[in-house]
Every structure is written in structure tokens, then in C-alpha cells.
């Protein structure tokens, strides 16, 4: 356990994330809770704590600077679609305390776990919903709508377009750059940025695709 804790701290440093004891402890507690529930509910195929830290926690936290950037530009009310076991939103919510995180999934066992994690970690900035996103109609739109392994870009945008603010951004985590998916985006929206993500201790392709309405900015492709 101590080895995994040190790896987490080193990974956070590699990502340029300043983390105190509170943040590190909550991340470790979340990984332990995920593995405990996973024995019964099969929430993830990953069953080793070291892999959870690398492939779930650090992978999710590669998004932190981009949430900060877009949160500053367009607002901090976020929706994570197909949230599964709370990734990437739960790790992000630990650091972005001023953000309003909303997580939605159709699978009851996953939502039950996420609700327990929110209670156990005392996350005051997280709300959880168990329903289909196309049937979800909150009173206010969202500034940022994110997903991690939810669907194609076109489906992601189409299913959530009624939920996004006119100046908002869709943020989709992908493995390889999904060129064909980008080409199939519906009219009126386009890719603003394609950002190559570097996950500490992992040699794997990861990309963040930022999508917006095309009237906001000319679509650009940016690899960093």
C-alpha cells in the first residue's frame, strides 16, 4: 500500500499537480473503496491497486488543467456522462472544490457505488443521477460535459446537446485520435482542440477531444 501511495504522489508531481495530505488520502481511499466493491459488483476489469492508481486515478487527472482552463473560460457546472465508477469526475472533484460536478449513468450498481464514494469521501460538490442522459432535463444547462469511454463523438454530442450551454464545451477522453469520429460530428459543432495526454508510468495513447459549437471559434487541431 505504501508503495502505491508513493507512486501516486510521484505521478501527481509528474502531472504538475500540487496535492496535500487530504487530496492524497481521498484518492487512496477512493481506490480502496473501488477495489472493495469491485469484488462483488464487478465495476471495473482492473483489480490491482497499482493499476487503479495508474489507469484510473492518474489517467483521470490528466484532465485537471483542461477542466481548470475551460472552467475559467465558460463556467464550472459540469456533467460527466456514463460516469461508471466515478471516473474521471471523482478524482477531479477532489481538486476542483469550486466546481459543481454532476454524474449520470444508467447502471444502478455503479451509481450506488458512486453515491457511497461521495458520502465516504465527504464530497460536497458532487451530485449523482441514475437515468438515461437523453431523458435528463435539469433546470440549468452545463458549461462542460465530459465522458470517458461513453460512445462515439457524434452520439455523445447528439445525446447531450439539450443539456449544454450555448458557450459550453464537450470534453471526450479517447485512446487513439478518433479521426473518423471527428469527421462524423453533426453540423454546427466542430473540434476545437485535440490534446495528446501523457499518463505517468503508462505507455499508451490518450487524447482529449474538445468540441464546441462552430460559431464560437474556428475548429483547430492542437497536439501538445
PLM-predicted stretches and their roles:
Residues 1-5:
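Acidic, low-complexity proline/glycine-rich segments
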Residues 7-73, 119-121:
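Class I SAM-dependent transferase core
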Residues 59, 80, 105, 143:
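Acidic active-site catalytic centers that drive phospho-/nucleotidyl reactions
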Residues 75-82:
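Conserved class I S-adenosyl-L-methionine
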Residues 85-97:
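Conserved SAM-binding loop of SAM-dependent methyltransferases across substrates and taxa
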Residues 99, 106-212:
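S-adenosylmethionine
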Residues 214-220:
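Conserved small/polar residues in nucleotide/adenosyl-binding loops
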